[in-house]
């Protein structure tokens, strides 16, 4: 759909109907969440002191239990697709049956091969967290189930949708032990892995009875999480800026040389 919109506005600009070609920014789709993944990456770069320090760092992108079974796959897919480009050791962890798009896994594997990193999968949250530098525990819906739901909606089979929802809730409830606990965090690199989340997180004992993360873990990383979230508007602005100029680096250099005050009082 987004590609169709881009084609339409491009044609409108070419035909003189639109004076300018609008920039389309993907704020989230079924496949990817680029603004979130890049905000995550910018946060990681800041925390580890530069992009040159990311090679060999282990990041665990792990499924985690949430009372809501139908969360998008775009965040884990965006993360494994981007982080593998920087030579990181990316581990995708989830219970059996919670696979992501196979096409995205293929992209992640190819990226890791090119960057000198690695991309591995496991059905053990503990294995993923062990000695990890970064952890990203988050719930998502099974890809196969979302395909089935789309088919049912397309056929107008609302009874089938109700039955599928019951099945998914039952499947989801079997994995309440997939949670980011203090015990799991203690197994990470020096017990101090960077905890990431796209927010809002399902916090055990706060927003739900049982959720993705222990309240004590979330509270300890609350300030870094808000910093992580704060990067997103700048990521979006950068995307628009890059789309508007042929040589954005030159534009930024000229703005710096001009010395125009950035803060007006």
Give the role of each language-model region:
Residues 145-209:
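ADP-ribose/adenylate-binding Rossmann-like module
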Residues 45-151, 155-159:
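Glycine-rich phosphate/diphosphate-binding loop of Rossmann-like nucleotide-binding domains
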Residues 18-22, 110-120, 191, 220-222:
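A short helix-to-beta-strand connector/capping loop
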Residues 23-27, 33, 39, 61, ...:
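General beta-strand structural signal in soluble alpha/beta enzymes
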Residues 18, 53-55, 84, 183-192, ...:
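Short, conserved loop/helix-junction motifs that constitute active-site signature segments
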Residues 188-265:
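Adenosine-phosphate binding glycine-rich loop
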Residues 1-45, 203:
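Phosphate/diphosphate ligand-binding glycine-rich loop within oxidoreductases
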